[in-house]
């Protein structure tokens, strides 16, 4: 396929690329009109790190951000039940982000952001702190990540795995990590976002105060830890039904409006104008 045909394909309906041999090691790329290069948002879906939910749930947000002038990289990854868990899930998220320079598309790799919902929020903040690993743990590189993330956005996520393990009696966290923090402290040390603070970029947390799936306490605790350690984390709390767990992936909702407001704001490192 010629470069011109590829770009036309990306503009009209996007394309799916493989970043590894497994069928879950795929991602969809959408690029807005215009010469570019365009800022990039990496989307990471949730679903308790299990195989029952896939990247399709993020397509509404992808479509909205595409219209606002962003290139969108909506990733899939191996999850518990289809070859994922420790360390594969973490390795896949890192590999998907590091695959961006290999794409023949007008992407501005100096302006890459990451956004995740629920379990994807955990993975987004973990990916944002990969530069702190430096050769230790999945997804680490001795010279640092190939792609530098400029800002991280996490929606209703789990940012303290050890605390979630205790709160939920193991559950999804135990399935992801292969056990608890007392028996596997080395895994939690490199897989738990709370242990990797402060991130080197600004973080936006959005969470509903009445979320019955993932308590807002996780966002509050993470924000306190980041800011206390010299980092920058902002928390937007959504009250009432507008802050339910799944409302975050509705592009018409208040939770998503908080994200797009941040992306337009002066504090954001990237603020493209909406595409008419």
Residue ranges and their predicted role:
Residues 205-207, 211:
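Short beta-strand/loop motif that positions the catalytic acidic residue
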Residues 1-35:
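N-terminal cap/lid segment of alpha/beta-hydrolase-fold proteins
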Residues 6-12, 162-195:
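Mobile cap/lid helix-loop segments that gate and shape the active-site cleft of serine hydrolases
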Residues 212-221:
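Conserved alpha/beta-hydrolase "acid-adjacent" motif
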Residues 33-37, 41-64:
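Short, surface-exposed "cap/lid" segments of acyl-processing enzymes
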Residues 53-62, 73-111:
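Catalytic nucleophile-loop/oxyanion-hole region of alpha/beta-hydrolase
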Residues 98-167:
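Primarily recognizes the serine-hydrolase "nucleophile elbow" in alpha/beta-hydrolase
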Residues 220-276:
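C-terminal catalytic histidine-bearing segment of alpha/beta-hydrolase fold enzymes
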